[in-house]
Each structure stands twice: as C-alpha cells, then as structure tokens.
Design a protein with these regions (language model features):
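Alpha-helical transmembrane segments and immediately membrane-proximal extracytoplasmic
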Residues: 1-218
C-alpha cells in the first residue's frame, strides 16, 4: 500500500570494546531495575485507586485533575500521549531531560490505572529511550545508541519477550548496533526477574537455571 515502516537510523555507533560493552551492560542493568519499578508503580497506583477512589467516575475525574495539574506545573505536554516525541528526540538527536523517564512513568501509571484506555508498550519504549539517553550522556557513551538499546531493553524487561525485543531492534534501528542491542536485551531480561506488565503471564522455564518452573509473573 506504499506505507513505509517506522525506522530510527542510529548513526553514532562506536566499535564494540571492553569499555563500551561494560558501559552498555551498566545501562542495561539500569533498564532491568527500571522495568521492575515501572511494573510495581503500575500495580501500586492501581491498588491506591481501588482503595481510595472506588467509584470509577470519581476516580477518572480526580485522576484527570491530578494529571492536568502536574502537566501545568511541568509546563510541557511532552509526557502526554504515547511518548513518540520523546522517543524521536532521544534517538535522533540524543536529547532528553534528566527526569523525563520518571515523569513519563508516573503519568503513564496515573493515566492507565485510572481507567483511561491505551497501552503501556509505547510509553515503555519512551521511558527506556529517555533513560538510556540520559544514562549514556552521564557515562560518556553515545546517547543515541544508548537510547535505542535501552528502548528495547526496557520493553524486554516489562514483557519478558527477548526475541521480540531483538526483532524490534533490528527492524527499527538496523543491524549496525546489533551487538549492543543484544547485550542490553539479555541483561535487562535477567535483571528484571519475574515482574511483568501482564499479571497472567506465565514463565515456563527459569531465567537463571535449566529448570521447569511454570510460574506466574508478579
């Protein structure tokens, strides 16, 4: 139909060395931890809503007021919507504010668990991309590459889908940074443990041993 797929060319890709590999691994550990925090935040906000705002209409109205107030205080609409603008800026320009990923996490949880419809996947992408961009800048690593790798690493951490994350990275970013994407995805997958966005997801085999566990995610 003549529709081109979305791609984000990553131009600043350093050669893989022990130093760059370790920096990528450190960022990936951060993505795994952030994956856990995101899952816990979503669950906790949902529980608080259910406890203190049992009426769904009041809950939605109160949540809307809180979200609008936070947006006015922050003086930006960057955290509204799925977060595609944050993703593009982080990967294409290597730009992200230090707290972008935290505000996006909070506002996503407040919105989704209040009852507004949408998905967590693209917001998870934007959280990962902005975190990676900031972490890359701190570590003296390519912010663009760190944003791309962290985007799929955090996605893997919250969904427990490493193969899907790998294929998404190749489709969106190409194969030039494949080694970094694989490092980030594998480490985030291990660090994130058995947390997930999906409460009914089942992990059949242990992430750490060749053992059948057949357990539900947290």
């Amino acid at each position: 139909m003549g529709i081109d797929p979305e791609t984000f060319p990553v131009h600043s890709i350093p050669g893989l060395t022990v130093g760059t590999g370790l920096k990528m691994a450190l960022i990936a550990v951060g993505c795994g931890i952030l994956s856990i925090l995101f899952c816990i935040l979503l669950k906790t906000v949902g529980q608080l809503y259910a406890k203190y705002l049992k009426n769904p209409y009041i809950r939605i109205a109160v949540a809307a007021g809180v979200i609008i107030l936070i947006t006015i205080c922050l003086n930006t609409k960057d955290y509204m919507g799925a977060g595609s603008g944050l993703i593009a800026r982080a990967i294409e320009k290597g730009e992200a504010r230090p707290l972008d990923f935290l505000w996006k996490m909070l506002l996503t949880a407040l919105t989704m668990r209040a009852g507004y419809r949408g998905g967590e996947i693209v917001p998870a992408f934007s959280i990962g991309a902005t975190f990676g961009c900031v972490a890359g800048g701190i570590l003296g690593f390519s912010p663009e590459l760190a944003a791309a790798a962290s985007m799929v690493a955090l996605f893997c951490g919250v969904t427990n889908c490493p193969i899907t994350a790998m294929l998404i990275s190749f489709e969106l970013f190409g194969f030039s940074g494949a080694a970094y994407y694989l490092i980030a995805i594998s480490i985030s997958y291990a660090v994130s443990g058995y947390y997930s966005l999906y409460k009914d997801q089942t992990i059949v085999y242990s992430k750490y041993k060749a053992r059948y566990i057949n357990r539900k995610t947290r």
